[in-house]
C-alpha cells in the first residue's frame, strides 16, 4: 500500500520528471565514458524497420512530446495565459531576439574562419530540457512563466527548423511536403466539422509525421500541427474536451518515459583530449557566450522593447527576474544545437566533438544559472 502511494505521489509531482531527466543525463554521460559505450551506441544504431533506434527516439517519440506541448499551448491560447494578444505576442518577440542575438555573437567571434558555418548553433533551445528544469522548481515558478517558456521554445524550434530547411538541408522533397499539406487540410476539415473522436485525428497524424520526415523537414513539427487541430470544445460542457483528454492521457508517458529515454539517447557524449582547450577559442566562445549571454540578452531585450511599445505585457504575476531566469533556461541548447553542429561540420569529426563539448558546457551553465535565479526569485517572493 505504501509503495502504491509512493508511486502515485511520484507521478503526480511535476518535480519528479525533472529530477528523473537529470538522472538520465548523468547516467548517459557515465555510460558514454565507460567500457559500455560501444555496446550502448550499438543499441542506438540498431535498425528497427527502416530506421535506427536513435531516429525512432528523436523523430518518433519526440513528435509525441511536441504533440503534448502543442496541446498545452493551444489550451493556453484559447483559455489561459496566452488568450489575449499582449500575452501571446511576447513569446514570439522573445524567441526572435533569442535567435538573432546568439547568431550575431557567434558570428562576431567566428566571422571569416572555418567555424563560420555554425552560426545557427547558438540559436536553438532544447525544449525538453528547459521545461524539465522548470518542472524541478515546481510551484515556486509562476505558471505564466512556464507557459511563456514553452511557447518561446516552440517558436524557437520552429525558427530552427526553418533555418535548417533553408541553410542546412541538401534537398527538400516537395512531393512529400505537398502530401503533408493535404493531410493538414484533412485535419483542419475534421476540426471544422466538429469530429470529436481522437482516432480520426491520430491516424492522419501518423501519415503527417511520415510525409514530414520524408520531405527533409524535421518530423517533430508534425506533433505541433496535429495538436492545433485537436478540438478544444466538448459537446457537453461538464465533460473535458478531446484536447484536455488527450493532454491528460499523454502527460505521464511523456514526462516519465519519452523524455528520460530522449535524455539517455542524446547526451551520451564521449569526452576526448583537447575538448577543454576548444572552449577557450573563438569557436568555444561563440557557442558558450551565444547560448548563455545571447539568449539572456536577446530574449529580454526584445521582450523589453515589445512591452515598452505596449505591444506585449509581462506574464501574469512575474517580474523581470523571472524573465531573466527564463532567458537563461532557453540557453539550454543540448540536442537541437548538437543537431545543427553536426549539419554545420559534416566533414570534420574534430569540430563536431568540440562543438558538442561547448554545447554541453553552455547548457549545464545556462540550466544551473537559470535554476538558481528562479529559485532565488521564489525565496524573495515568499519573504515579501
Could you tell me what each predicted segment is?
Residues 2-13, 193, 197-207, 211, ...:
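Predominantly late transmembrane helices and immediately cytosolic-facing juxtamembrane segments
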Residues 25-39, 266:
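Alpha-helical transmembrane segments of multi-pass membrane proteins
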Residues 36-50, 110-115, 162, 170, ...:
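Membrane-interface helix termini and inter-helical loops of multi-pass transporters
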Residues 55-66, 113-128, 169-185, 218-225, ...:
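Structural signature of hydrophobic alpha-helical transmembrane segments
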Residues 77-104, 173-185, 271-297, 320-324, ...:
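Entry/N-cap segments of selected transmembrane alpha helices
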Residues 93-131, 288-344, 361, 365-376:
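Transmembrane alpha-helices that form the ion-translocation and gating core
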Residues 104, 163-164, 213, 217, ...:
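Hydrophobic alpha-helical transmembrane segments in multi-pass integral membrane proteins
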Residues 134, 138-140, 144-231:
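Functional cores that coordinate and move charged inorganic groups
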Amino acid at each position: 500500500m505504501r509503495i502504491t502511494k509512493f508511486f502515485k505521489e511520484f507521478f503526480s509531482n511535476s518535480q519528479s520528471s525533472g529530477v528523473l531527466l537529470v538522472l538520465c543525463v548523468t547516467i548517459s554521460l557515465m555510460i558514454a565514458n565507460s567500457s559500455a559505450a560501444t555496446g550502448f551506441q550499438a543499441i542506438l544504431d540498431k535498425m528497427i524497420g527502416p530506421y535506427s533506434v536513435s531516429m525512432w527516439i528523436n523523430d518518433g517519440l519526440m513528435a509525441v512530446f511536441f504533440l503534448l506541448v502543442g496541446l498545452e499551448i493551444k489550451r493556453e491560447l484559447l483559455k489561459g495565459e496566452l488568450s489575449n494578444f499582449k500575452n501571446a505576442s511576447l513569446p514570439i518577440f522573445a524567441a526572435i531576439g533569442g535567435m538573432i542575438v546568439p547568431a550575431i555573437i557567434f558570428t562576431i567571434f567566428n566571422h571569416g574562419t572555418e567555424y563560420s558555418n555554425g552560426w545557427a548553433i547558438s540559436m536553438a533551445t532544447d525544449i525538453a530540457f528547459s521545461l524539465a528544469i522548470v518542472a524541478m522548481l515546481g510551484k515556486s515558478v509562476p505558471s505564466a512563466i512556464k507557459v511563456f517558456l514553452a511557447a518561446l521554445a516552440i517558436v524557437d524550434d520552429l525558427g530552427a527548423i526553418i533555418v535548417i530547411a533553408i541553410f542546412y538541408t541538401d534537398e527538400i522533397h516537395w512531393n512529400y511536403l505537398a502530401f503533408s499539406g493535404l493531410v493538414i487540410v484533412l485535419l483542419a476539415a475534421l476540426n471544422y466539422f466538429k469530429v470529436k473522436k481522437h482516432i480520426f485525428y491520430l491516424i492522419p497524424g501518423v501519415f503527417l509525421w511520415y510525409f514530414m520526415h520524408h520531405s527533409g523537414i524535421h518530423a517533430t513539427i508534425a506533433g505541433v500541427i496535429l495538436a492545433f487541430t485537436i478540438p478544444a470544445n466538448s459537446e457537453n460542457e461538464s465533460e473535458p474536451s478531446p484536447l484536455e483528454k488527450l493532454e491528460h492521457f499523454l502527460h505521464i508517458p511523456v514526462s516519465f518515459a519519452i523524455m528520460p529515454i530522449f535524455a539517455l539517447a542524446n547526451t551520451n557524449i564521449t569526452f576526448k583530449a583537447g575538448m577543454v582547450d576548444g572552449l577557450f577559442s573563438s569557436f568555444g566562445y561563440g557557442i558558450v557566450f551565444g547560448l548563455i549571454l545571447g539568449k539572456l540578452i536577446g530574449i529580454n531585450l526584445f521582450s523589453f522593447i515589445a512591452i515598452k511599445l505596449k505591444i506585449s505585457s509581462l506574464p501574469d504575476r512575474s517580474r523581470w527576474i523571472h524573465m531573466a531566469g527564463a532567458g537563461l533556461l532557453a540557453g539550454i541548447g543540448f540536442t537541437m544545437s548538437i543537431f545543427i553542429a553536426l549539419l554545420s561540420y559534416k566533414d570534420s569529426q574534430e569540430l563536431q566533438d568540440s562543438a558538442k563539448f561547448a554545447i554541453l558546457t553552455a547548457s549545464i551553465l545556462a540550466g544551473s544559472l537559470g535554476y538558481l535565479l528562479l529559485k532565488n526569485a521564489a525565496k524573495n517572493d515568499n519573504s515579501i
